C-alpha cells in the first residue's frame, strides 16, 4: 500500500526503519505520464523500496508564468502511484523544503550553454532541490530521464563532487508514436500546436545539419532557441506557441553540424 508523506519529519522517522533495504528514488514535479512510470518501474525492478517525490520546485523556474501554468495534479499523481505499487510518495510543501527561503543554493559555475544560457538560474534551482531531496531520501539509486540530458550530467557531477552515496541512473527517453518525447508540457499543447510539435520531432530526427534543421523549423513557424551538437549528441530547444519543448539524440560522428 502506498504511503503518502507530507511532513519531512515523518519521512525521516520512516527512513530509519528501512536502512537495511535498497531504496530507489524518482524525483518529479508531478503531472505523471508514461515516461515517469518507466523510471518507477525500473526502480521497482532494481530496489526493495521505491520512493516518488511530487514537488513543483519554484526555484528552477526563470519564468513566473511557466511556474504558474505548470499542471498541478497531485490527487491524480497519487492515484497513479497507488496503481503502480509505489511504496512511498513524498509530497512536501515549499516551506518544508525551503525553510531557509532559498538563502543557500548549489550552483555550477562552469556551465553556460544550452539550457543554462536560455534559462538563467534554472540549474541553480534544480541542483539545490535535488541535493535537498537526495539528502532526505538517502536513496541507493536515483533515476532521471535522458530527456533532460544536461540536467542528468549535472546531477551526476553533483553526486560525485559532494561524495553522495547514491548511484545516479539515466534512463532512455520515452517517446510517442511520432518520436516526440513525453513531457508534462505536451498536455498544454492545443491540437494545432501538437501537430506542429510532431513536425518539430520529425525535422529534428532527420539527417539534416543543425543549420538546415533550424531553417526548416523556422519555416514551420517554430521559434528556435538552439539546435547544436555537443559530445556526440544533438540537442534542441524550441517554442511551439507558448510551450517550450526540448529533445536530444545521439548522432553519428560523421554527421556533426
Curated annotation (Swiss-Prot):
Binding site residues for ATP: 29-36, 145-148, 174, 182-185
Signal sequence annotation: none
GO cellular component: cytosol
GO biological process: pantothenate biosynthetic process
Keywords: ATP-binding, Cytoplasm, Ligase, Nucleotide-binding, Pantothenate biosynthesis
UniProt-annotated binding residues for beta-alanine: 60
Residues involved in (R)-pantoate binding: 60, 151
Subcellular location: Cytoplasm
Active site positions: 36 (proton donor)
Pathway: Cofactor biosynthesis; (R)-pantothenate biosynthesis; (R)-pantothenate from (R)-pantoate and beta-alanine: step 1/1
EC code: 6.3.2.1
InterPro entries according to UniProt: Pantoate_ligase, Pantoate_ligase_C, Rossmann-like_a/b/a_fold
GO molecular function terms attached to this record: ATP binding; pantoate-beta-alanine ligase activity
Keyword Metal-binding: no
Primary role: Catalyzes the condensation of pantoate with beta-alanine in an ATP-dependent reaction via a pantoyl-adenylate intermediate.
PANTHER family the UniProt entry points to: CYTIDYLATE KINASE/PANTOATE-BETA-ALANINE LIGASE, PANTOATE--BETA-ALANINE LIGASE
Subunit structure: Homodimer.
Note: The reaction proceeds by a bi uni uni bi ping pong mechanism.
Protein family according to the UniProt entry: Belongs to the pantothenate synthetase family.
Protein known as: Pantothenate synthetase
Organism encoding this protein: Coxiella burnetii (strain RSA 493 / Nine Mile phase I)
